Amino acid sequence: MNNIIDGKALANEILADLKLEIQGFKEKTQTSPKLAIVLVGDNPASMIYIKNKIKNAQQVGIDTLLVNLSTNIYTDDLISKINELNLDKEISGIIVQLPLPSSIDENKILSAVLPSKDSDGFHPLNVGYLHSGINQGFIPCTALGCLAVIKKYAPNLNGKDAVIVGRSNIVGKPLSALLLKENCSVTICHSKTCNLSSITSKADIVVVAIGSPLKLTAEYFNPESIVIDVGINRISNNKIIGDVDFENVKSKVKYITPVPGGIGPMTIAFLLKNTVKAFKNAIAL
């Protein structure tokens, strides 16, 4: 049995459905979703991510607007630019590519995006909806992608033990809320956790998002583990590897996502899905 999860194939299924849905919008309303991507500076890694987002958006019929601003921009000026996008009725969704330069107040910027156009799901209001169990607003895309993969291979999560290694607002915290809603018993671990392997090795599901190359080795898992590696670490020659020692772990677990080709494509698919949701909400479809 092939236990390596093909995130690209799963993402392509979502993209195919979105493409059909958007074609229907165009026939019915003569309009289509539009995603604004705000980039500050010219970080090479950010440029690669944005290129992939635009490519996939165009593939399904979502228009895009790239707003590329100087690294030297002030927080207030960036907020003003975001407000312009908030008021633009042609824009369905807005994302701000992270990380931002250290001179910019990231919390203020993420809070400036209109919650109803918050395709990334980072606005405090949307975060509050998620953690309050209110079925409203937008959920961070990587967390949605992780949950979709997990449910594909473990449809019934009732009573499952899930360990999330990493406590970020992008992955760890939102995914913990989603897994709790699925009736998992959830443990969040982080850099200060003692005896990490003794915790992860007992879990049914282990999600790793710490940004530390090949950190988790075979002894961190058991033969029934479903391992979701969210790590994206660039090493020499621009090669990308995950947080899990994939080559030595893959034969020791039930299922595992590779890096690249695992959660990355799913993140983009759910970003576009969120954008379509914002578009539908705006025109009350």
Curated annotation (Swiss-Prot):
Q: What Gene Ontology terms for biological process does this UniProt record contain?
A: L-histidine biosynthetic process; methionine biosynthetic process; purine nucleotide biosynthetic process; tetrahydrofolate interconversion
Reactions this protein catalyses: (6R)-5,10-methylene-5,6,7,8-tetrahydrofolate + NADP(+) = (6R)-5,10-methenyltetrahydrofolate + NADPH; (6R)-5,10-methenyltetrahydrofolate + H2O = (6R)-10-formyltetrahydrofolate + H(+)
Q: Which GO terms describe its cellular component?
A: cytosol
What UniProt keywords apply to this chain's record, in alphabetical order? Amino-acid biosynthesis, Histidine biosynthesis, Hydrolase, Methionine biosynthesis, Multifunctional enzyme, NADP, One-carbon metabolism, Oxidoreductase, Purine biosynthesis
Q: What is its EC number?
A: 1.5.1.5, 3.5.4.9
> Pathway, according to UniProt?
One-carbon metabolism; tetrahydrofolate interconversion
The record's listing under PROSITE patterns reads: THF_DHG_CYH_1 (PS00766), THF_DHG_CYH_2 (PS00767)
Q: Which Pfam families match?
A: THF_DHG_CYH, THF_DHG_CYH_C
Q: Which InterPro entries match?
A: Aminoacid_DH-like_N_sf, NAD(P)-bd_dom_sf, THF_DH/CycHdrlase, THF_DH/CycHdrlase_cat_dom, THF_DH/CycHdrlase_CS, THF_DH/CycHdrlase_NAD-bd_dom
The molecular function terms of the Gene Ontology recorded here are: methenyltetrahydrofolate cyclohydrolase activity; methylenetetrahydrofolate dehydrogenase (NADP+) activity
Q: Which residues of this UniProt protein bind NADP(+)?
A: 166-168, 191, 232
The stretch of residues making up the signal peptide is none
Which purpose does this protein serve, as stated in its record?
Catalyzes the oxidation of 5,10-methylenetetrahydrofolate to 5,10-methenyltetrahydrofolate and then the hydrolysis of 5,10-methenyltetrahydrofolate to 10-formyltetrahydrofolate.
What is the annotated quaternary arrangement, including any partners? Homodimer.
Q: Which family does it belong to?
A: Belongs to the tetrahydrofolate dehydrogenase/cyclohydrolase family.
State the name under which the record lists this protein: Bifunctional protein FolD
Q: Name the lineage.
A: Bacteria, Pseudomonadati, Pseudomonadota, Alphaproteobacteria, Rickettsiales
